[in-house]
Amino acid sequence: MLYKSIDEFVKVIDKKKRIIGLDFGEKKIGIALSDKTNLVAIPYSVYIKRSTRKDLGSLYNIFVENNVGSMVIGWPIELSGIESELCQKVVLLANRIIAKYKINIYLHDERYSTAMATRVAKLANIKRKESQSIDDKIAAMLILQQVLDIMKIYQI
């Protein structure tokens, strides 16, 4: 099921499984995973998009290999709060994942996540050229970590 409410999403999380976080872009998908305790988000990879079928298959392999039970996807709304064009693509992807793999997905406001990822890379003294290849997975990590921190409040 697709959730835009964190209140509803936290009720359906399988505590025994990990959570995957995605930063969905036009050409790439940043991927992060929670640790086994669902307390810490860890950058996982940057996936270069190919076709929907191949993308879904690759994501499924990650689900299985890492015991994933739920997903958080960055919701790319504009700074003004208006849904961006990419929002429709995110919903389409989310609905395809749900239909095919029966996984619960939460759409989390991702405003500033890419800017924060760039800042994190800069603070870690990672050169700009290098950081461009990891910004997406850092953004996914930041998005997922925000949700994990909220879950701590709910004591999930």
From Swiss-Prot:
NCBIfam families named in the record: RNAse_H_YqgF
Cytoplasm listed as a keyword: yes
GO molecular function: nuclease activity
HAMAP family: Nuclease_YqgF
EC category: hydrolase
Cellular component terms (Gene Ontology): cytosol
Compartment list: Cytoplasm
Function: Could be a nuclease involved in processing of the 5'-end of pre-16S rRNA.
Name this protein carries in UniProt: Putative pre-16S rRNA nuclease
Cross-referenced SMART domains: YqgFc
Pfam families, per the entry: RuvX (PF03652)
Example of a GO biological process term: rRNA 5'-end processing
Family: Belongs to the YqgF nuclease family.
Organism: Ehrlichia canis (strain Jake)
Primary subcellular site in the record, as a coarse category: cytoplasm
EC code: 3.1.-.-
Keywords linked to the UniProt accession: Cytoplasm, Hydrolase, Nuclease, Ribosome biogenesis
